[in-house]
């Protein structure tokens, strides 16, 4: 598990819970990359004995130059989608109802905001998050358009 960072304790616990052992990168047959913000460093940690590399999030674009056919590369695709979709829906509802203004207000006034019900919703990207948010929007009877490549 490299490089050293604030996620280490949680990742070590997950590896051990799954029956694995955490050892030095030079001894390991697998590498769990723990620093999504430092893709440029991964090459310096890769070793010939690594037959599997786990990347930290769904998108692999920052690591594209490091990918090879010598080892199995996996990522977090689908892991975060349900939680991100739920959070996105919460943010849309907060925005539509102007909750930030009401949270600071000291008195009730005429409501400002709009309904999500029946709204036209455009989703940019058709990946896992889009797939998970669409069912969450269905009860609101939205007209949904997904734009993808």
Regions of interest found by a model, annotated:
Residues 30-104:
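Phosphate/diphosphate ligand-binding glycine-rich loop within oxidoreductases
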Residues 2, 33, 55-57, 125, ...:
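Short beta-strand/turn micro-motifs composed of small residues
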Residues 14, 87, 91, 132, ...:
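Rossmann-fold NAD(P)-dependent oxidoreductase module
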Residues 112-149:
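Rossmann-like dinucleotide/phosphate-binding beta-alpha-beta segment
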Residues 23, 64-65, 112-114:
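Short secondary-structure boundary/capping segments
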Residues 1-30, 37:
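N-terminal glycine-/charge-rich "phosphate-binding" loop or analogous flexible N-terminal tail
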């Amino acid at each position: 598990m490299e490089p050293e960072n604030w996620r280490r304790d949680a990742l070590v616990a997950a590896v051990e819970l799954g029956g694995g052992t955490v050892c030095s990168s030079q001894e390991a047959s697998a590498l769990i990359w723990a620093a999504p913000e430092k893709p440029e460093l991964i090459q310096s940690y890769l070793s010939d004995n690594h037959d599997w590399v786990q990347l930290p999030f769904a998108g692999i674009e920052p690591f594209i130059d490091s990918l090879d056919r010598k080892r199995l590369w996996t990522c977090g695709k689908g892991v975060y989608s349900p939680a991100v979709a739920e959070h996105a829906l919460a943010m849309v509802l907060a925005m539509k109802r102007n909750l930030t203004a009401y949270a600071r207000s000291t008195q009730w006034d005429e409501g400002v905001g709009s309904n999500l019900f029946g709204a036209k919703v455009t989703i940019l990207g058709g990946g896992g998050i889009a797939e998970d948010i669409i069912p969450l929007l269905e009860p609101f009877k939205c007209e949904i358009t997904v734009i993808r490549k």
